[in-house]
A protein has these predicted regions:
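Domain-length accessory/inserted modules outside core catalytic folds
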Residues: 1-161
């Protein structure tokens, strides 16, 4: 979840990575002691392409990589928190967005992700937590799409008269 969050945060800024850059960035983010070996390069490169294709899709069916509903709530909440932190890390790592480019809506979303990155304390879990979790994941999904399209708008060709 954290790696997907990082990648989507990075891509949302309009930045793209070469294969070599992605291999280096992902290995560093995951704190791998060695770079990706030959067997693991293909899946991580495929992950990049799949995520980019999904977030760019016209059908807006991008989904967050979360553990299944069969997992304990704490495990799912931890993954969601890691996704949100990853998004913020990737968004910042791109270095493409100046403070002047951050609208009020974008700032609000970034603040939400910051709050999400802290998760829900075990003491705060009750019968409404499951519903709240589902709503938070959907909110993150929709706002990730918003962020991507906000900073990745196609450049309009000037109209010649």
């Amino acid at each position: 979840a954290a790696m997907q969050g990082w990648l989507i945060g990075y891509l949302s800024t309009g930045a793209r990575l070469t294969k070599e850059q992605w291999l280096a960035e992902s290995a560093e983010y995951l704190a791998l002691p060695d770079a990706w070996n030959d067997k693991s390069k293909l899946p991580i490169l495929g992950f990049y392409q799949d995520e980019l294709k999904q977030i760019q899709g016209q059908d807006l069916d991008y989904t967050l990589l979360m553990p299944s509903d069969d997992e304990d709530f704490d495990v799912r909440m931890q993954a969601f928190s890691e996704w949100a932190k990853g998004f913020l890390d990737g968004f910042g790592a791109s270095g493409r967005i100046a403070e002047a480019d951050i609208t009020e809506d974008v700032m609000e979303i970034l603040k939400h992700y910051d709050a999400f990155s802290y998760g829900i304390e075990a003491d705060d879990i009750d019968e409404d937590s499951e519903r709240l979790f589902t709503e938070l994941v959907e909110h993150a999904r929709v706002t990730a799409l918003f962020m991507f399209y906000h900073f990745n708008q196609a450049q309009q060709e000037p109209i010649l008269h």
